[in-house]
Regions:
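Fungal secretory targeting signals
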Residues: 1-22
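Solvent-exposed, well-ordered loop and adjacent helix/strand elements within mature globular domains
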Residues: 24-185
Length: 185
């Protein structure tokens, strides 16, 4: 569910609280190329840990997916809790394509914990960009292997919101599938 995010060293809570969130792209049904800060989360560091629970199921009941158009990988997005309502930065069910991973992903989970996730890095973003947190799996892999994969995929990279169905894919979970990373298109 709500994923625990470790604050990046050097950032203070005060600077996070004062930072303005990025202007989030709006799904239109037409492909939109954009840059995003992409991170990964796994079975091992999900909230609660060692589970596959997700907060906003759309295509899956639990975190997972094979990265195809018809079975995209679960992805988390920042969110806000306002007057007790959980508001995602981008609507659940929004589809993305990540060219560096050659995976389709779908918003089905939230990134950020606590009573005010809007004060955390997932909602605030990174370098003025939206923060996308893809589920790298790890159920069948050692924690060190999934952590290494998460570290390898972390960074600013191109993504496509509302992609078409004919993108090149590497089928399988991110970690267990080899954690392949391709050059930017």
């Amino acid at each position: 569910m709500h994923r625990i995010i470790t604050l990046i060293s050097g950032l203070s809570l005060a600077s996070l609280a004062m930072a303005a969130p990025p202007e989030n792209p709006v799904p239109t049904g037409q492909p939109q190329a954009l840059q995003a800060y992409v991170t990964g989360y796994s079975y091992w560091d999900n909230t609660p840990p060692s589970t596959v629970e997700i907060s906003h199921p759309v295509r899956h009941r639990f975190a997972g997916g094979m990265g195809t158009f018809s079975n995209p990988v679960t992805m988390a997005i920042g969110h806000q809790i306002i007057a007790g309502e959980d508001i995602l930065d981008i609507p659940a069910g929004t589809l993305f394509y990540l060219p560096r991973l050659r995976k389709y992903a779908i918003i089905e989970d939230t990134c950020g914990d606590g009573p005010s996730p809007q004060d955390g890095p997932c909602h605030i973003g990174k370098k003025g960009l939206i923060w996308l947190d893809i589920y790298v799996d790890g159920v069948s892999a050692d924690k060190v292997v999934s952590d290494t994969c998460m570290s390898a995929i972390t960074g600013v990279q191109p993504v496509v919101m509302d992609p078409g169905p004919n993108m090149s894919v590497v089928v399988g979970p991110v970690t267990e599938g080899g954690c392949f990373i391709f050059p930017d298109p």
